[in-house]
Amino acid sequence: MRARPTLFIAPLFPLLIVGTSVDRPVQTVSQPSDVTLTVVVTGASTEGGTIGASLYSTADGFPGQVAKAAQTSARPRTAPVDSFVFRGLAPGPYAVSVYHDLNGNGKLDTNLFGVPKEPWGTSAKVRPRLRAPRFEEGTLNVTASTRVEIRVER
């Protein structure tokens, strides 16, 4: 009677699993990054209200869903030029949206069709008329500390 090869291999199967799991690289906890993105906001015509900026690391939520942003910041507008610094960024693609909340209600007001009634801007190089800019159009490849200027307009 011939011995089956599967009977010989079967007892070694648990060793194969253990061997492959030991060979995997150990994941380490990432250290905080010193990469920053400075966003300079220009073009707001009046002082007053609130100026806000949101940083997105994925297309999900860009440009208008602040709750899905990786980082966000807003403050009363008191100077002709505002800037925001986003710190501790992992190198990679990001997109930024900014708005000038003129009436201070905490959001970008839009008309019946969803078109903004208050000044806004993004890191996108295009400003589509019938849709919001896409994440891919506004992607900044941040690998070191970077500065970008975004103009807000109606």
Q: Where would I find each of the regions flagged by the language model?
A:
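Bacterial N-terminal signal peptides that target proteins for export
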Residues: 1-11
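Bacterial N-terminal signal peptides
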Residues: 9-19
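A short, amphipathic beta-strand motif
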Residues: 35-43, 53, 150
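Beta-strand signatures of extracellular beta-sandwich domains
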Residues: 52-56, 97
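Short strand-edge motifs at loop-to-beta-strand transitions and within beta-strands
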Residues: 80-84, 136-138, 146-148
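Short, flexible loop/turn segments at beta-strand junctions in immunoglobulin-like
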Residues: 86-89
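A short tyrosine-centered beta-strand micro-motif
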Residues: 92-98
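Acidic, glycine-anchored loop motifs typical of Ca2+
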Residues: 102-110
